[in-house]
C-alpha cells in the first residue's frame, strides 16, 4: 500500500492513512515478539474460588475500573475515526474500562476536527485520557494549549507519547528531541491532571523511566515491541524509497513488552504502570499483570472489532474478560495482587 503524500501532508490525511494501514496492512513487527510467550502460569487444580464470584475490578489513578484494561490511544481527526471512537466509548462505559484517544494535536491546528474526539457524553464515568505527542512541546505547543486539550475532552489525565523512531521514518517527522525532558517536567508542574508518558511500540528502558519519574510524571506505559510497528506503518506510507527501506529495516526495533515491563517495575515498585505493545488476548494481559502491570492496554484488537460493528466489539470484550476471569480462577488468585505471588507465573 502506497500513499502519495507530500512533505506537509495534512494531519487528518495522515491520521486516515495510519488508520487504514493499521486495519488492512501487515504492520506488525515481523520477527520480534512481546516476550510474554516465554512465561506460563502454574495451574491450580483445586482453586478455593467461585468463577462467577470473582471481581475483576481494580483502581488506577484513583478511579475504579471494571477490569484492569485500557482501550489504548488510537485515532481521531476523521469521520471514520469518529465512528470508531464513539463505539469504543460506548463499550468503555458499559464495561467500565479506561480509554485513551488518539493524538489531539490536530485539534489545535484544525478545531473543526474536535467532534471526532468528543466521547465524554457517551462515556461520562470512564477514566478518559487525552493524548499529545511529547515532542510537540519542542515545536511550540504550550502547557496552556495542552490544558486546553484536556479540558475540551473532559479528560482525567494526559498521555504524552514518545515516538522517536516513528518520527525518524515519517516523511513529516519532528525529530528535535533536545531538552524535551525539561519541558515534560514543566508540563507536569503546570497541568491540572496527572501526566502519563508512553512509548508507541518500542518500549521504555529503566533509564528513561527513572528520568521521567524524576520529572514528575505520574504514570508510565511501556508500550513495548512485539505488536504494531510504527516504523513499518510510516515506511508503508512513504513514497521515498529510502524511507520505505528504513521502515522495514527497523520493523523489529525496540524493547519487547515483557522485558520493558520488568525494567520499569524495577525502577519503582509503586509507580502506576501500564503494559501495552502486542497484547492480543486475555492470557497475555494476565501475564503482564503478573509481571507487575497495574493496567493493560490493547489497541489493534479493539480497533479491528470496533471497525466491524458494536456487536463484534461487544463479543470481543466479553471474550477478553472471560479469559482474564479463567486465569484468575485457574491460578487460585482471589484478587489481582494474588496473581503476582511467587511461582504463579513461571518462565517456560
Curated annotation (Swiss-Prot):
Listed InterPro entries: Aldolase_TIM (IPR013785), FMN-dep_DH (IPR000262), IPdP_isomerase (IPR011179)
Cofactor(s) needed by this chain: FMN; NADPH; Mg(2+)
Gene Ontology biological process: isoprenoid biosynthetic process
Chemical reaction(s) catalysed: isopentenyl diphosphate = dimethylallyl diphosphate
Residue sites binding substrate per the record: 14-15, 103-105, 166
EC number: 5.3.3.2
Binding site for FMN: 72-75, 103, 131, 198, 228, 278-280, 299-300
Family: Belongs to the IPP isomerase type 2 family.
HAMAP family according to UniProt: Idi_2 (MF_00354)
Protein name per its UniProtKB record: Isopentenyl-diphosphate delta-isomerase
Native source organism of the sequence: Synechococcus sp. (strain ATCC 27144 / PCC 6301 / SAUG 1402/1) (Anacystis nidulans)
Upper classification of the organism: Bacteria, Bacillati, Cyanobacteriota, Cyanophyceae, Synechococcales
Amino acid at each position: 500500500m502506497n500513499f502519495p503524500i507530500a512533505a506537509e501532508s495534512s494531519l487528518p490525511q495522515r491520521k486516515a492513512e495510519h488508520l487504514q494501514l493499521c486495519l488492512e496492512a501487515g504492520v506488525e513487527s515481523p520477527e520480534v515478539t512481546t516476550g510474554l510467550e516465554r512465561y506460563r502460569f502454574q495451574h491450580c487444580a483445586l482453586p478455593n474460588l467461585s468463577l462467577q464470584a470473582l471481581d475483576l475490578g481494580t483502581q488506577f489513578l484513583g478511579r475504579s475500573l471494571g477490569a484492569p484494561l485500557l482501550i489504548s490511544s488510537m485515532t481521531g481527526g476523521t469521520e471514520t475515526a469518529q465512528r470508531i471512537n464513539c463505539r469504543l466509548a460506548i463499550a468503555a462505559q458499559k464495561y467500565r474500562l479506561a480509554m485513551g484517544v488518539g493524538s489531539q494535536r490536530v485539534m489545535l491546528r484544525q478545531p473543526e476536527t474536535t467532534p471526532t474526539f468528543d466521547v465524554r457524553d457517551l462515556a461520562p464515568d470512564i477514566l478518559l485520557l487525552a493524548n499529545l505527542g511529547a515532542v510537540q512541546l519542542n515545536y511550540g505547543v504550550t502547557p496552556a494549549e495542552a490544558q486546553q486539550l484536556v479540558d475540551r475532552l473532559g479528560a482525567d489525565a494526559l498521555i504524552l507519547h514518545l515516538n522517536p523512531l516513528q518520527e525518524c521514518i515519517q516523511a513529516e517527522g519532528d525529530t528535535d528531541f533536545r531538552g524535551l525532558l525539561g519541558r515534560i517536567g514543566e508540563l507536569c508542574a503546570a497541568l491540572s491532571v496527572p501526566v502519563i508518558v508512553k512509548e508507541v511500540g518500542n518500549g521504555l528502558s529503566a533509564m528513561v523511566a527513572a528520568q521521567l519519574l524524576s520529572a514528575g510524571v505520574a504514570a508510565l506505559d511501556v508500550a513495548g515491541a512485539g505488536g504494531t510497528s510504527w516504523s513499518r506503518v510510516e515506511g508503508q506510507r512513504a513514497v521515498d524509497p529510502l524511507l520505505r527501506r528504513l521502515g522495514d529495516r527497523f520493523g523489529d526495533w525496540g524493547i519487547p513488552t515483557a522485558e520493558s515491563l520488568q525494567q520499569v517495575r524495577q525502577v519503582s515498585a509503586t509507580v502506576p504502570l501500564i503494559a501495552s505493545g502486542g497484547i492480543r488476548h486475555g492470557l497475555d494481559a494476565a501475564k503482564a499483570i503478573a509481571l507487575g502491570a497495574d493496567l493493560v492496554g490493547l489497541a489493534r484488537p479493539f480497533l479491528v472489532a470496533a471497525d466491524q460493528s458494536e456487536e463484534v466489539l461487544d463479543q470481543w470484550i466479553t471474550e477478553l474478560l472471560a479469559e482474564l476471569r479463567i486465569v484468575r480462577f485457574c491460578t487460585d488468585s482471589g484478587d489481582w495482587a494474588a496473581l503476582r505471588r511467587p511461582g504463579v507465573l513461571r518462565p517456560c
